[in-house]
Curated annotation (Swiss-Prot):
Gene behind this protein: recR
Protein name per the record: Recombination protein RecR
SMART domains for this protein: TOPRIM (SM00493)
Natural source organism: Porphyromonas gingivalis (strain ATCC 33277 / DSM 20709 / CIP 103683 / JCM 12257 / NCTC 11834 / 2561)
Keyword Protein transport: no
GO BP, one annotated term: DNA repair
Pfam families (alphabetical): RecR_C, RecR_HhH, RecR_ZnF, Toprim_4
Function, as annotated: May play a role in DNA repair. It seems to be involved in an RecBC-independent recombinational process of DNA repair. It may act with RecF and RecO.
Zinc finger extent (C4-type): 60-75
Lineage of origin: Bacteria, Pseudomonadati, Bacteroidota, Bacteroidia, Bacteroidales
One of the record's GO molecular function terms: DNA binding
Swiss-Prot/TrEMBL keywords: DNA damage, DNA recombination, DNA repair, Metal-binding, Zinc, Zinc-finger
Length: 207
């Protein structure tokens, strides 16, 4: 049954809200009606924040985290451990690890994991830039903190092989996170312990 709306403008707003992940048309209707009940200035500020988000946020040229300028706040922080690099899939993983307060090093965001079924190969990820960072910066340890999935494990092994000849220590977070889980959904205590209890990657696999 096709839903009819009393206003073309309302329907237009619903159409836009419904494009968001996890938002159906009923939820989109509730959101649109909620905004209608707000003061006009509040709605303007909401809309302006979304436009600013899209137009002005960029990606850190060093680690590929989100940034308001060329370099993100983490990379620009002189108090961070510049010798340790934590490799993650996406920006949400950076936020999850930061919330544990158990890690004070730098990050490198791959932008995903190797997944042939999805057409994602090594060349589609920020792997070359990772190798370049390890070669050009004073990195002593690379921590692999990817999802405990088949794709995550495949990517871990690929990265280990790429970095093996550099002499840098390559470690992997402990298996406190259930197999098949993604980093961002792990609770802070479990994730924090997984980082603290990390082990050398070479000890975690059989060649």
């Amino acid at each position: 049954m096709i839903q009819k709306y009393p206003s073309r403008l309302l329907e237009k707003a619903i159409d836009q809200f419904a494009t968001l992940p996890g938002v159906g048309r009923k939820t989109a209707l509730r959101l649109a009606l909620y905004l209608l009940r707000q003061p006009v200035e509040n709605t303007r500020q909401f809309a302006a924040a979304l436009v600013d988000l899209r137009e002005h946020i960029s990606y850190c040229r060093r680690c590929h985290n989100i940034s308001d300028s060329g370099v993100c706040t983490i990379c620009a922080d002189p108090t961070r451990d510049q010798s340790t690099l934590c490799v993650v899939e996406n920006i949400r993983d950076v936020m999850a690890i930061e919330n544990t307060s158990q890690y004070r090093g730098l990050y490198h965001v791959l932008g995903g994991v190797i997944s042939p079924m999805d057409g994602i190969g090594p060349g589609d990820l920020q792997i070359d830039s990772l190798v370049h960072r390890v070669a050009s910066e004073q990195i002593h340890e690379v921590i692999l903190a990817l999802s405990t999935t088949m794709e995550g494990d495949t990517t871990n092994f690929f990265l280990f092989r790429k970095l093996e000849s550099t002499g840098v220590r390559v470690s992997v977070i402990a298996r406190g996170i259930a197999i098949g889980d993604e980093i961002e959904y792990a609770d802070e205590i479990t994730l924090g312990r997984s980082i603290l209890n990390r082990t050398d990657f070479s000890d975690s696999v059989k060649f």
